[in-house]
Every structure is written in structure tokens, then in C-alpha cells.
Amino acid sequence: MACGLALLLLAACGASAPPDDAAIVADFRNHQSNVEVTADGAVVRLLPDRTSSTGTHEQFIIKLTSGDITLEVEHNISIAPRVPVALGDHVIVHGEYEWNAEGGLIHFTHHDPKGRHEGGYIQDNGKTYD
């Protein structure tokens, strides 16, 4: 409970949650979804944008710094600015993890204009995009 309160206070003050790749690896192994995570990794593949009913999503793949797991990142550029990621960039990604057999994906990497979901972000080259 105290950790949850500390994270809530950090989020309320605009501070970022520390990366926890070990938690993501555990979420992957346990087929967990709908979990707020902060990942630390390198961009290994750029994907074309995808448009859905919720907007246009910038997509790329990262490999976690502390393991062999890769994650797809889906960043809604209808809500937040595009992140100018390039292959090899080191990024910190905070959002909601969804399990899949390829490693999983992280979405909600932006603020929620309706205020119903915890805000996420992507840090790239010293700048935060949310």
C-alpha cells in the first residue's frame, strides 16, 4: 500500500516512475495484461503508423535493456506529439502493458484527455513526450 501511495504521489507531482524491466519480464511469463509498467530499452525496429477508431498510432519495437524480451510500443499521435525515435535510441516508456506471445505491447503512453486512465509517457534523447 505504501509503495502504491508513493507512486501515486510521484505521478501527481509529474515525476517519472523508475524503470522496472524485471516486473515486465514477470508480467510476460505470467501472461499478465492491463498492468502499468515503465520499460527501459533500445529501439530495434520502426513500424508504419496504424490508424484505428481511437486515433493514429506511432509504432516501434524496443528490446528491454535487461533481457531478451521485445515490446511493441503504440503511441497515440492523435493525442500526443510524435516521438522522433530512431533505430538504436535508448527510450524509457511508461504505459499499460498488454501480454502477447511476442513479448507484449505498451500503449496509453500519453496523457488521457478524459482523465480516466493513468497518464503515460515516452522519454527519448532527454525529452519527455506525453
Which positions does each model-derived feature cover?
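Bacterial N-terminal signal peptides
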Residues: 2-11
